[in-house]
Amino acid sequence: MNQIKEQILGILGGIDRAGMDAVIEYLNASNYFTRGCYHHHKERGGLAKHCFEVYTFMSAHAEGLSAESIAVAALFHDLGKTRRRDGRGHGQRSLDILKECGFPLTPDERTAIGRHHSVSADFLTCPLRRLLTRGDCDSTGRWKHEHHNKKSSAEGVSRICGRWEKS
């Protein structure tokens, strides 16, 4: 867990944007580095581990996207999971946290983070959103397969992502 925390903070330290110090302060004060996810990566530190796995996937499949946007989308896409559910999706809560920290997002970063779980046309028109969804599917599917031997779950996630890509 500490190694992933150090790697994430190292990546974020290389991003020179307004509000980054406030975001890092939020990450350290919240349960971002210690909590697990609800449906996958349930272990302590699972949320940060999942976000780092998504970052690693996205970096390996960058498709000409900026390294900074990849880091922002991957490492912050599930930031909203650090707050209680409020009837809105965690993508929207992630955007709210970043706004509260004064952290500006590009339109593509906003779309990718806010809609990474929805099926909409921007999956086809926003390469960052498409890559984030693929990375999220990859990390989630691999975790479920490894920890629960849910081959059908991993295959199902891959099949869904593949169907989106072929659309």
Residues covered by each model-derived region:
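Metal-dependent phosphohydrolase cores
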Residues: 1-167
